Regions:
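Short glycine/serine-rich loop/turn segments
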Residues: 92-179
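Residue-level signal for the start and early helices of compact helical domains
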Residues: 13-21, 25, 30, 53-59, ...
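N-terminal, positively charged, Ser/Thr/Ala/Gly-biased leader segments
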Residues: 58-118
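An N-terminal boundary/leader segment
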Residues: 1-84
């Protein structure tokens, strides 16, 4: 399984510039920021990892992210090197993305569909979506929680709950579910 999200997970990753506020950034904002060198992929990835740490397991404990890719910062560094050399793979090069936990990826992240029955389920291939994202240089940041089995358990199951990640909280009203 990929690295479990924890408060001390990124202690060694001290930002070299003031922390990047990623809350309001759209994809076009991110692409423009990377292309104009306003921030690096490492800055962006670090900011998202720090935000996951602050909101997912600690703070309001949203349970939105099941695991993070321990290689994310290394991949961000490689993207920054490509951009510095003027050879990014695509406009998405260096953009961190979360995958829903039912999408296969051949890295250190298990694909569980939110079920403890699939903990440790490692695949040897990327789904076509993930292969395309990787070819573009996007960084698989981690796996997002989902309704267990993508809510194909029953017609009366709780949306946003999985045995691996727990119940995803609504970030705006914490005592309500996200769905």
């Amino acid at each position: 399984i990929g690295s479990q999200v924890s408060a001390d997970h990124h202690e060694a990753m001290k930002p070299s510039v003031p922390p990047l506020d990623v809350v309001a950034l759209s994809l076009p904002d991110i692409v423009h920021g990377l292309e104009s060198h306003r921030f690096s992929s490492q800055d962006l990835t670090r900011a998202y990892l720090n935000r996951i740490d602050a909101l997912n397991r600690s703070g309001p404990a949203l349970n939105a992210v099941i695991s993070v890719n321990s290689s994310a910062m290394t991949l961000a560094n490689k993207s920054d090197l490509r951009r510095a050399q003027g050879t990014p793979n695509s406009p998405l090069d260096g953009v961190p993305v979360l995958l829903k936990d039912n999408i296969e990826s051949k890295d250190a992240l298990a694909t569980t569909a939110g079920s403890t029955a699939l903990i440790g389920n490692m695949t040897r291939r990327d789904s076509p979506l993930v292969a395309s994202l990787r070819d573009s240089g996007a960084i698989v940041l981690g796996k997002a929680n989902l309704s267990q089995w993508a809510n194909f358990r029953s017609s009366h199951s709780v949306s946003g709950w999985s045995s691996v990640g727990g119940l995803v909280k609504n970030p705006h009203v914490l005592d309500r579910q996200a769905c």
